[in-house]
Amino acid sequence: MSPSSIRLYLVTAIMSGALIGVAALALPAQAEPRVFELSAPDAREVFLAGEMTNWSDGKVPMRKDADGRWRATIDLDPGQWLYKFVVDGKWIADPGSSDRDADGSGGQHSILFVGPGDWQVRPDIPRGHVDTAMVPSGLRSGGVKVNVYLPPGFERGKPYPVLWLLHGGNMDADQWFRTGHVERYMDNLLAREAIRPFVIVMPSDATSSYAGGSERFISGELPGWLQQTYGLRVDRRSSGVAGMSMGGYGAFRLAYRHPDLYGFAISLSGYFSDSYIASLSKQGTLPMQAVLLCGDKDDLVITNRKLVKALKAGGADFSYREDPGAHTWHYWSLRMVEMLTAADAYFTTGRLPMARN
């Protein structure tokens, strides 16, 4: 039901400004039993479904007690898990949990974090702030939604680096914030001085696939708004882009097309069409530094392998790694620290750490 082990990747070490390496360790996962409960005395049947059950494929029947509450207990490995209840055929978020977000299909999923990690909220440390704005754009009369993470003690006009985070399909700027809780990771990493302060910009893809009008907004209009609003200057030495799923493709595409703005791209489980891969096959070197990561049980691993083959044939310099995992936030949550520390390493040294097996 859950992986028997997870890979924990040690943070890139920086000493005197020099990159000294990235290591990988295979450690046994410390699974924890978790009890899921739902009060539904009139329901005929209730299932637990989520990333831990591959959603409907392995949904777990819940048992009804005399008090009208349905319960199920399963062991979960550390990390983030999305889930829902299926009540007499209707999929619902957990009414007992306030941590939830849009699911991209008109409903909501619930969010659970298991075990100690940088996903935890620590009340004893300084916390950053997330601004939400409808940024004026020629693309939409009402503007385009953007979330901006500002580190603790942010000062307008100070030269902060900028990491752009792109969301997946059918979602918006909230996904990295309200589902991924990237702000928690940032606060914790900053508190223990594992990274230096930088800003995270989470734009909405206003069209699709980060092309056309969406590309013009993100790479054309948004940098000017960031400078006007926060005093931030965006250039390749102090800016990079990352994303998951469709956002992984968007990160690679935007950095490839706008190397003056983005010095690196990190793609998590990106989708790359055959036509896009064909367009890159004869391009040779990449204009940006790039790291591609994908789960070995992700359906999109095939497109990633095709892209890797094409890039290698063209002589491109990049890094690719497959890890245990699927197309889930559980997988991405276990990559989050690596992604953020890699961005910090680039902002500090000018080099993006290569993903090591």
Annotate each language-model stretch with its function:
Residues 32-59, 63-357:
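Non-catalytic cap/lid and distal C-terminal segments of serine-dependent acyl enzymes
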